[in-house]
C-alpha cells in the first residue's frame, strides 16, 4: 500500500516511529482478541459435539429425537441470552472501557464452563439438573454477548486503517481455533473411551479442562491497554436505550452482513456432524476427525478474507461471497447428509472457504458502520440478536425441518433465505473501508 493511500486515510507510514511501535503491539492485540474467543467457542463446539451424550444425562429418557431437540433447544438458549449480555456488557465497554469488558466476559464464561462440567445429572437430582444446565448456558451466552463483539471492536480500533480487516480477523480466527480444539477434543475423547463411558462421564473432560484457557486469557488481558476510542466513549457516558433506536440502520445492516454466514456455519460444522454421528455411531470418530481437518481450511481462509477486504473493499467481497454460498449450499449439504466420509469432507470443504473468508472480514465491516458513542452496545446487540436467530437456532431448526419434512436437504433452503435477505440489505450500502472510527 502506498504512502499516498495512507495519507488519504489519515494514517502514518511504516517509517514513522509511532506507527512502528503500534505495529509491534499488533501481535499482543491480536492475541488479546483471540484468546477469549478460543475459550468461548471451544465450549460452544464441545456442547454441540456431545449433544447426544448431554441429552442422555440431563433429560428424561424419552425418544432420541425428543432428547436431541431438548439438547439443541438449550444450545439455542445460550444464544438468546446473548442480547441481554450485549446490552449489559456492551454498556460496560462503552461507559467504562473495552479492557474492563474483555476481562469480565472471559471470567464469566470460564467459570460457567467449568461448572457445566461438574453438574450432577438428571438421575442424581431430577429436574434440577436440566435447570442448572440451562443456567450455565444462559451465563455463557450472556458473557458471549459482550466477548465476541467487544474483542472485534478492540482489535479493529487498535489496528491501522490499512490493516483493519487483517488484524480484526484474529477475533474470528479465535472462534475457529476454539471449534478446532473442541472438535479435536471430542474426537480424542471418543477415540480413547468406550461409548458408554463417554456417555456417562467422558463428555465432562473438555469442560473441566477449559480452565486452562481461562487462566491464560485472564493473565493476557490483564496487561492490555485501553483504545483511544474507548477512552473517548467512556468520557461521553452515552445513554443506552435511546442509542439503540438511533442506530436502527446499522443494526439492520449487521443482520444482512452476518446472518447467512452464521446459519451456514452452524449447519455445516455443528448440526451436520452431530446428525451423521448419531445416525452412524460406529463412524462417529471419522466424522469428528474429518470435521476437525476441514475447520483448518476455515481457519486459514479467515485472515485471507480480512486481508483481501483491506485491498478490494468489504461490501464488494461480502456480496460476492453470499452469491458463492447460495450457489453451492445445496450440493454441499447433499454431500454432508448422504455422502460417504469422503463425500462429507467434500461437502464441508465447498462451504469452508467462503464461510471462512466472510467471517474474517465481517468484524471490521460491522465495527465500521457503527458510531463511536455506542459502538459496543449497539453492535453487540445487533450481532447477538442476529446470531441467536440465524446461528443459535440453526441446529434446532434444521432438526425440526428434517423431522417435519423427512428431507435432510431442507436446511439448505433455510440458509438460502438468509442469503437472499443479506443481498437485499447489503446492495444499497456504501463501502466501509475508509471510514474513521472516532466519529
Predicted segments, located by residue:
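Extracellular/periplasmic helix-loop-helix junction of adjacent transmembrane segments
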Residues: 51-84
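C-terminal ends and interior cores of transmembrane alpha-helices
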Residues: 107-126, 323-339
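Extracytoplasmic gate region of multi-pass secondary transporters
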Residues: 48, 248-298, 391-395
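Cytoplasmic membrane-interface "Motif A"-like loop-to-helix N-cap segments
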Residues: 95-107, 311-323
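Multi-pass alpha-helical transporter architecture, strongest
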Residues: 217-224, 417-439
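Glycine-rich segments within core transmembrane alpha-helices of 12-TM secondary carriers
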Residues: 165-190, 213, 382-394
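C-terminal transmembrane helical hairpin of 12-TM major facilitator-type secondary transporters
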Residues: 315-362
Amino acid at each position: 500500500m502506498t504512502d499516498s493511500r495512507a495519507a488519504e486515510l489519515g494514517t502514518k507510514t511504516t517509517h514513522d516511529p509511532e506507527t512502528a511501535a503500534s505495529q509491534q503491539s499488533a501481535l499482543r492485540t491480536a492475541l488479546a482478541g483471540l484468546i477469549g474467543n478460543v475459550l468461548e467457542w471451544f465450549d460452544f463446539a464441545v456442547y454441540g459435539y456431545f449433544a447426544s451424550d448431554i441429552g442422555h444425562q440431563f433429560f428424561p429418557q424419552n425418544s432420541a429425537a425428543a432428547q436431541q431437540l431438548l439438547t439443541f433447544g438449550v444450545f439455542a438458549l445460550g444464544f438468546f441470552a446473548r442480547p441481554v449480555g450485549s446490552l449489559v456488557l456492551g454498556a460496560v465497554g462503552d461507559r467504562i472501557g473495552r479492557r474492563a469488558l474483555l476481562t469480565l466476559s472471559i471470567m464469566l464464561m470460564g467459570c460457567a464452563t467449568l461448572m457445566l462440567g461438574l453438574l450432577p445429572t438428571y438421575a442424581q437430582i431430577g429436574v434440577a439438573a436440566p435447570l442448572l444446565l440451562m443456567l450455565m448456558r444462559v451465563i455463557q451466552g450472556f458473557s458471549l454477548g459482550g466477548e465476541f463483539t467487544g474483542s472485534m471492536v478492540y482489535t479493529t480500533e487498535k489496528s491501522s486503517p490499512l490493516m483493519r480487516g487483517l488484524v480484526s480477523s484474529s477475533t474470528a480466527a479465535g472462534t475457529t481455533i476454539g471449534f478446532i480444539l473442541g472438535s479435536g477434543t471430542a474426537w480424542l475423547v471418543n477415540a480413547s473411551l468406550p461409548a458408554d463411558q463417554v456417555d456417562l462421564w467422558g463428555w465432562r473432560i473438555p469442560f473441566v479442562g477449559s480452565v486452562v484457557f481461562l487462566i491464560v486469557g485472564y493473565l493476557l488481558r490483564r496487561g492490555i491497554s485501553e483504545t483511544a476510542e474507548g477512552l473517548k466513549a467512556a468520557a461521553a457516558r452515552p445513554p443506552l436505550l435511546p442509542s439503540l433506536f438511533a442506530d436502527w440502520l446499522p443494526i439492520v445492516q449487521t443482520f444482512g452482513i452476518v446472518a447467512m454466514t452464521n446459519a451456514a456455519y452452524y449447519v455445516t460444522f455443528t448440526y451436520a456432524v452431530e446428525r451423521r454421528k448419531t445416525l452412524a455411531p460406529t463412524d462417529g470418530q471419522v466424522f469428528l476427525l474429518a470435521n476437525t481437518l476441514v475447520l483448518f481450511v476455515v481457519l486459514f481462509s479467515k485472515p485471507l478474507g480480512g486481508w483481501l477486504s483491506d485491498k478490494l473493499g468489504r461490501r464488494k467481497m461480502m456480496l460476492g461471497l453470499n452469491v458463492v454460498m447460495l450457489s453451492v449450499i445445496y450440493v454441499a449439504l447433499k454431500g454432508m447428509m448422504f455422502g460417504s466420509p469422503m463425500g462429507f469432507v467434500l461437502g464441508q470443504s465447498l462451504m469452508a472457504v467462503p464461510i471462512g473468508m466472510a467471517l474474517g472480514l465481517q468484524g471490521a465491516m460491522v465495527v465500521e458502520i457503527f458510531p463511536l458513542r455506542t459502538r459496543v452496545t449497539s453492535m453487540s446487540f445487533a450481532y447477538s440478536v442476529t446470531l441467536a436467530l440465524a446461528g443459535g437456532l440453526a441446529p434446532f431448526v434444521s432438526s425440526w425441518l428434517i423431522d417435519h419434512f423427512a428431507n435432510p436437504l431442507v436446511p439448505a433452503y433455510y440458509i438460502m433465505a438468509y442469503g437472499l435477505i443479506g443481498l437485499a440489505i447489503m446492495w444499497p450500502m456504501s463501502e466501509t473501508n475508509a471510514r474513521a472510527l472516532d466519529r
